[in-house]
């Protein structure tokens, strides 16, 4: 509803029609479709809201929120002509919708683990011209090789050379947590803390 009130829906559709890349994650993924149905009025008092119509699916909001840490594989992500394949990719889901195709589209990811339980769930789709895709998986850009592949595909469109992975997100995150722990240990009376805990 916010997109429509602000007129952003027309802007996004106009840019997509010009071939500008569009990526939707979670709620953005749902909005790329034809319609978002909300029979339980989870998100609003509307029974349904028209989507952007950029992807061939309909989402129905459910009463229960899905929250999972996920591991997924990607057999092929042809976004902007790239040829990315990857396994053991990480992310997370936090959504209340179920998305169903209205006609065929290429699936992107195969979720193989949800909160440490083995599953086989298809997630995400890409359009026929390979410049629009969406997924329920948050954190896809935390996967270094996938992020670099997408950045390089965008660089190629601008006539720039491709670059290797230059930043390792998970290593950085771990080192920052270690640094935080060191700071806490240095400036906090841990012995007293454990005494209080009993």
Q: Where are the model-predicted features located?
A:
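Amide-donor transfer/coupling interface in amidating biosynthetic enzymes
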Residues: 13, 58-198
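Cysteine-nucleophile active-site neighborhood
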Residues: 1-80, 85-88
């Amino acid at each position: 509803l916010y997109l429509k009130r602000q007129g952003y829906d027309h802007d996004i559709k106009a840019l997509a029609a010009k071939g500008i890349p569009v990526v939707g994650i979670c709620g953005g993924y749902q909005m790329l479709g034809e319609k978002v149905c909300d029979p339980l009025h989870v998100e609003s008092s509307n029974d349904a809201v028209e989507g952007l119509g950029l992807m061939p699916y309909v989402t129905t909001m459910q009463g229960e929120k899905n929250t999972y840490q996920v591991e997924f594989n990607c057999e092929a992500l042809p976004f902007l002509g790239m040829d990315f394949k990857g396994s053991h990719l990480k992310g997370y889901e936090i959504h209340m919708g179920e998305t169903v195709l209205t006609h065929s589209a290429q699936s992107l990811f195969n979720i193989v683990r949800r909160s440490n339980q083995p599953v086989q769930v298809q997630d995400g789709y890409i359009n026929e011209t390979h410049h629009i895709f969406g997924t329920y998986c948050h954190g896809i850009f935390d996967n270094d090789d996938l992020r670099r592949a997408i950045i390089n595909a965008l660089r190629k469109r601008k006539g720039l050379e491709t670059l290797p992975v230059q930043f390792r997100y998970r290593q950085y995150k771990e080192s920052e947590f270690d640094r935080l722990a060191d700071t806490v240990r240095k400036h906090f009376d841990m012995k007293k803390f454990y005494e209080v805990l009993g």
